Amino acid sequence: MTVLLIMQPLFKIFKMKKLASLIISILFFSNLLMSQVMPQGFLIGPDGLIGTQRWMLKNLDVTTFNDGTPIAQATTNAGWNANSSPAWIYNNLDATNNQVYGKLYNWAVINNSLNVCPVQYHVPTYSDWLVLQNFLGGTPSNYMVTGGGKLKQTGIVTWDTPNTGATNSTKFNAVGNGYIGGGNSFSSSLKSSALFWSKTVTGSNVYYAKLNYNDDNLYVGPGITTGGFAIRCIHD
């Protein structure tokens, strides 16, 4: 009886330790799952269904392709403009913008045999963006549909005022990540626009998607390949 009385609290302590260890493991992996991407390219969220498509709900924020091949950082205007190999950059060269807005990438990252998106995901094609446009507002006119506000975060923290039409009803969570212009302009447009790459070339240009702070449209049309845009990955 004495042995049983001693063993009972010890057994309870053992069970509590196992439970604590299990909770720590769950918390660790939950935190991992809320991160975006591991260098090896495994998806760890977040993503969501918009119409028939599954989109990642944050701008891409990686420094490697999904096989671990590094992507160089550009740290100056000249370095960005001179870089014909894959590169990423902080908007306004300011690392504090990274957490909210993600990174901007050059065309060499997109136009590459390696995939910068997680395994089973890819940089959207023009057709992918067109499907999203159709879901939001029907057939585009002059490359635009009304309904882009359904993609934009509400308020004026990540967008300039008035942030027209923003409802974020799709949970796409678009922020005003801006862009890096080609040539010597190095315009950022932080909080006033959000530009996203597609993989689809048209002539000497490439299709890209754009949202603005002062209208409710989603534009998907041709633009230059010398800029730096954000990436939103979509499921294969």
How does the language model describe each region?
Residues 36-236:
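Conserved positions within compact, well-structured domain cores
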Residues 1-38:
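Bacterial Sec-dependent N-terminal signal peptides
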